[in-house]
Amino acid sequence: MATVQFFNQFPCKTRVQSSANSKPLSKPPSSLVPMSALTRRPSFPPGEFAVSRSDFRVRVIDAEDELDPETSEGGGSALLMAEEAIESVEETEVLKRSLVDSLYGTDRGLSASSETRAEIGDLITQLESKNPTPAPTDALFLLNGKWILAYTSFVGLFPLLSRGIVPLVKVDEISQTIDSDNFTVENSVLFAGPLATTSISTNAKFEIRSPKRVQIKFEEGVIGTPQLTDSIEIPEYVEFLGQKIDLTPIRGLLTSVQDTATSVARTISSQPPLKFSLPGDSAQSWLLTTYLDKDIRISRGDGGSVFVLIKEGSPLLNP
């Protein structure tokens, strides 16, 4: 538009066509502008306004420069941060799976060798350094629910985990259920026998003492009534010291014993749970949560003992 305005400054008159009787002009009128004036680059005396063409500079960059936070305005930096966050999450998931795999066959820590314990301890430390919930007590919705004990270094539980403590009875599950609405904790041990299961649990209240630590005060213990399991199927034979022993002659006797035991178990099952109080001196403890997400919780208790728990319903419970 500046060029058009520049050309409009020149005077211009319309040329009138002469009639047939008129004489041709001997020379062009002085008011007409010669073509050379239109094609010649105009010059401006000093101080006059001149229009210049803008300069355009083009910079070629490659893909690496585009992702460099120093050369990009902000998009590259945001993309780099997003990629780092995704990579961190993937590393955490790999660590979680590696930890769960290393727990296989340890019987919650009872049967773990010293080498396995060292490997588990290293994986726990790595996970704690990537804790996505720095203040677990501010995220009670994650703490809420039932947690299954997968591993512990607490030697006080080892006698309980030992299979020889009661013949034919094993520890089927150890769990902790947290109700963040009522600030209660239930620790439960489920025992499984040939005909029934039963549980021993403790009920407690907890108080928040820091972003990671809660104080626990146990109130009572409960011995649950046995729950009947399916009947035992008596095999035709068993192997003992490499010899097959035929059970057919005594299957009737074994069936009679089983029926009697079932009758006794039904009688016991109809009774209410047995509750008992806990001594005041040993009824308090504290718990420090060092890692927490929707699947895994790592806590440390008195004396530095560590507990690895997996949330009920998590796919990590299915190896």
From Swiss-Prot:
UniProt KW keywords: Chloroplast, Plastid, Transit peptide
Subcellular locations according to the entry: Plastid, Chloroplast
GO annotation, cellular component aspect: chloroplast
Main location: plastid
InterPro entries: PAP (IPR039633), PAP/fibrillin_dom (IPR006843)
Keyword NAD in record: no
Induction, as annotated: Down-regulated by drought and oxidative stresses. Up-regulated by wounding.
Chain segment of the transit peptide: 1-59
Regions of compositional bias (Low complexity) in chain numbering: 18-36
Location of region: Disordered: 17-39
Tissue expression notes: Expressed almost exclusively in petals. Very weak expression in all other organs.
Stated role: May stabilize the accumulated carotenoid structures.
Family affiliation: Belongs to the PAP/fibrillin family.
PANTHER family linked: PLASTID-LIPID-ASSOCIATED PROTEIN 4, CHLOROPLASTIC-RELATED (PTHR31906)
Record's protein name: Plastid lipid-associated protein 2, chloroplastic
Gene name for this UniProt entry: PAP2
